[in-house]
């Protein structure tokens, strides 16, 4: 830590400015008020599309960074309000239309439902039998499992949460208006990164985790322990009363009684004295290091989760005291930046990280680009942990929820990462000043861009040719009836030795990585089968030739996505083809008339193309996950302890040919969605067709050019003129960029909804 003389600290001064900027609907009610041209009203039909395109482009409304910052800050509160309203809706459905209590009473036989379809013209067929006499639509969001983890024991509590979330939404809306129209932060407040880091690290993450750990210890852990005992058929006794049903469990506020809590966790009786005297072992019954999964619920131990949050809290509270604010002590981010001189081998930059501090505190696009890339990566990591280390009770045996959560977190991650590239490119076009980045690391990366992109291109060709080549070889050999010449576990074996080594290392490390951990980090890494209610919750995952092959397809598609996105960022300002690209802006269709062969070079077009490859990459990932789990992990446990897997372990032999993927996965598992009519999954059958249509509709926008439509429109306008019904607003074809945007939006929406219907109809029936 840098200890500086006291004069280096800055005096605290007001960071907020009182503004007289009344919130008036006179202004907001006027479409296009933010743009002089749009405010004049529509002359052509392009007006409405430009309105949509530019409404949230605050940079285009004003060049005043403080004003832009205030608008973004205010919009964040609006976003939070929408989230609270959305949460309130989820809680309300749980309170009013769900079988939550029924599910809590028998989670292995009752399916979760929080939606009941009302009969109007026969759609009550969609209400399936959820068990225990409840008819409804099965949900796959995992909310019931989360609520049980929080310690919610009744629909009444959910209704209280629904009301509370609406109150919070109101507060957020109020805050958004107040901090823009009444008391708005000054620019220096937004740029005070040390203070922001201290507050976010120590406050949001540190104290947030600590208070959550408090909830887990005082509410979640005791409620979970009592429920687990009921589910295991060995109910516990509290104050001489047997807790035989969920209704018998004390309400959260009753656990304020320390004596009551100490009956479940004697360590609570040690009080706070044990903490200050260093006798932390007294707490080892509710802050545990068990590892593995709870055999009753197939989820991580609640006391392990509480311990984790205490540890996270300590780390982040310490981290939140590292940065220099009003006192001359701690790190300065600017000094840290300027002390870094870059990588001496890869990017020897004489000026190191000089100028990056200013770039990141004046370009919110640059900041957002980094944050989206990291948050997207985090979402993808969450997807992997949902099955490898399931945190919520009974979630691991709710296969539809597991597929749903994996798919959801993968898509979210993909979109955020592409968004990261988009905002990085916008930052390069709008905010990057080459004069301020001479020979620093960013400049050196830009100077090396040809080497970076050409190498990445070579990697993509190598991965694509070899990984696809393995499949082509196998399809050819199988077609010719030569199984002995195929790449497979039983013929020419290619084992993923590095992945197997990682699995073994994790399995062997139990007991040595964490103090006295009783089990390994995940059963997926060479652990043992955990069965709950006769279904597999977790099991060791065997890896072989089929996994090796599809893994390299993943490597190929991810690298192509990175190639497209990175090329868009590195060539956003200029290229050999268009040296003055920065002057043309973030999105432009081509470099003007008379300059052919310059289409699809804008940074926006790279985002557009990157989205397709992101979709491509993740489709293969979620198909791989879905099939692998059904083949090698999920299934029912027989009386002799053997496992009957859903697809009987066919992955290793079928996933090594393209024909196998098409026939034994896509076609075989589409049986349920194609045959769903007349059953309670028929909505997915219709959705499967409808989403295919939306996907196909996108191709009309992607394959045809603007001129085709403009010609057609002019002929239609002629007919209107003939009939004297000409419109006052002149019809215009979508611009080239708008057409592509509509195309990619429908392509992704159609593709994702098709996959959703395909997964659901299948796994709801067989899972």
UniProtKB/Swiss-Prot annotation:
Keyword match Translocase: no
Enzyme Commission designation: 1.97.1.12
Function: PsaA and PsaB bind P700, the primary electron donor of photosystem I (PSI), as well as the electron acceptors A0, A1 and FX. PSI is a plastocyanin/cytochrome c6-ferredoxin oxidoreductase, converting photonic excitation into a charge separation, which transfers an electron from the donor P700 chlorophyll pair to the spectroscopically characterized acceptors A0, A1, FX, FA and FB in turn. Oxidized P700 is reduced on the lumenal side of the thylakoid membrane by plastocyanin or cytochrome c6.
NCBIfam families reported in the protein's UniProt record: psaA
Domain of life: Bacteria
Protein name: Photosystem I P700 chlorophyll a apoprotein A1
Cofactor, how bound (note): PSI electron transfer chain: 5 chlorophyll a, 1 chlorophyll a', 2 phylloquinones and 3 4Fe-4S clusters. PSI core antenna: 90 chlorophyll a, 22 carotenoids, 3 phospholipids and 1 galactolipid. P700 is a chlorophyll a/chlorophyll a' dimer, A0 is one or more chlorophyll a, A1 is one or both phylloquinones and FX is a shared 4Fe-4S iron-sulfur center.
Gene that encodes it: psaA
């Amino acid at each position: 830590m840098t200890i500086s003389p006291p004069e280096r600290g800055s005096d605290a001064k007001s960071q907020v400015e009182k503004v007289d900027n009344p919130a008036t609907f006179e202004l907001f009610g006027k479409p296009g008020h933010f743009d002089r041209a749009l405010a004049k009203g529509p002359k052509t039909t392009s007006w409405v599309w430009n309105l949509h395109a530019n409404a949230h482009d605050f940079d285009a409304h004003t060049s005043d960074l403080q004003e832009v910052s205030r608008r973004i800050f205010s919009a964040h509160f609006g976003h939070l309000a929408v989230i609270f309203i959305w949460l309130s809706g989820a809680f309300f459905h749980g309170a009013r239309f769900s079988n939550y209590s029924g599910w809590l009473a028998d989670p292995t036989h009752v399916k979760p439902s929080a939606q009941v379809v009302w009969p109007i013209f026969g759609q009550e067929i969609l209400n399936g039998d959820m068990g225990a006499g409840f008819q409804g639509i099965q949900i796959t969001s995992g909310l019931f499992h989360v609520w049980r983890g929080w310690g919610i024991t009744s629909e009444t509590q959910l209704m209280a949460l629904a009301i509370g979330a609406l109150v919070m939404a109101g507060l957020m809306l109020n805050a958004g208006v107040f901090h823009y129209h009444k008391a708005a932060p000054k620019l220096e407040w937004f740029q005070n990164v040390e203070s922001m880091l201290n507050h976010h690290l120590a406050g949001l993450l540190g104290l947030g985790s600590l208070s959550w750990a408090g909830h887990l210890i005082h509410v979640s852990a005791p409620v979970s322990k009592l429920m687990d005992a009921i589910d295991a058929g060995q109910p516990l006794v509290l104050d001489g009363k047997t807790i035989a049903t969920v209704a018998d469990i004390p309400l959260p506020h009753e656990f304020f009684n320390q004596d009551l809590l100490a009956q479940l966790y004697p360590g609570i009786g040690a009080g706070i004295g044990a903490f200050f005297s260093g006798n932390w072992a007294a707490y080892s019954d509710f802050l545990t290091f068990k590892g593995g999964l709870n055999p009753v619920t197939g989820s991580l131990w609640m006391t392990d989760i509480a311990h984790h949050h205490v540890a996270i809290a300590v780390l982040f509270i310490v981290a939140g005291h590292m940065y220099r604010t009003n006192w001359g002590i701690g790190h300065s981010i600017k000094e840290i930046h300027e002390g870094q001189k870059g990588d001496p081998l890869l990017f020897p930059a004489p000026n190191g990280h000089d100028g990056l501090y200013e770039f990141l505190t004046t370009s919110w696009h640059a900041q957002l680009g980094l944050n989206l890339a990291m948050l997207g990566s985090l979402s993808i990591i969450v997807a992997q942990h949902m099955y490898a280390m399931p945190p919520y009770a009974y979630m691991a045996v709710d296969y539809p929820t597991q597929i749903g959560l994996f798919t959801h977190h993968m898509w979210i991650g993909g979109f955020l990462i592409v968004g990261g590239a988009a905002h990085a490119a916008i930052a390069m076009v709008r905010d990057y000043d080459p004069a301020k980045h001479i020979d620093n690391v960013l400049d050196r990366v830009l100077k090396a861009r040809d080497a970076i992109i050409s190498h990445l291109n070579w990697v993509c060709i190598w991965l694509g040719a070899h990984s696809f080549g393995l499949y082509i070889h196998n399809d050819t050999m199988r077609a010719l009836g030569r199984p002995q010449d195929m790449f497979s576990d039983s013929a020419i074996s290619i084992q993923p030795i590095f992945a197997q080594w990682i699995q073994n290392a994790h399995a062997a490390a139990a007991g040595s990585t964490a103090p006295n951990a009783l089990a390994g980090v995940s059963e997926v890494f060479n652990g043992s089968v955990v069965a709950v209610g006769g279904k597999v919750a977790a099991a060791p995952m065997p890896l072989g030739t089929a996994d090796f092959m599809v893994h390299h397809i993943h490597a190929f598609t991810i690298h192509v996505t990175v190639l497209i996105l990175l090329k868009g960022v590195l060539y956003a300002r200029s290229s050999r083809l268009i040296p003055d690209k920065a002057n043309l802006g973030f999105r432009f269709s081509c470099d003007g008339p008379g300059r052919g062969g310059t289409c699809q070079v804008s940074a926006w077009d790279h985002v557009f193309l990157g989205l397709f490859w992101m979709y491509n990459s993740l489709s293969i990932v979620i198909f791989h996950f879905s099939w692998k789990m059904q083949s090698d992990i999920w299934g029912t446990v027989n009386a002799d302890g053997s496992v009957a897997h859903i697809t009987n372990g066919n992955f290793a032999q079928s996933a090594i040919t393209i024909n196998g993927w098409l026939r034994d996965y896509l076609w075989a598992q589409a049986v349920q969605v194609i045959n769903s009519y007349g059953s309670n999954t028929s909505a997915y059958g219709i959705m499967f067709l409808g989403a295919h249509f939306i996907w196909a509709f996108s191709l009309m926008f992607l394959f045809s050019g603007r001129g085709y439509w403009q010609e057609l429109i002019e002929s239609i306008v002629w007919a209107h003129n003939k009939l004297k019904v000409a419109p006052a607003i002149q019809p215009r074809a979508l611009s080239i960029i708008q057409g592509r945007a509509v195309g990619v939006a429908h392509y992704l929406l159609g593709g994702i909804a098709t996959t959703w219907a395909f997964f659901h109809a299948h796994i709801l029936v067989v899972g």
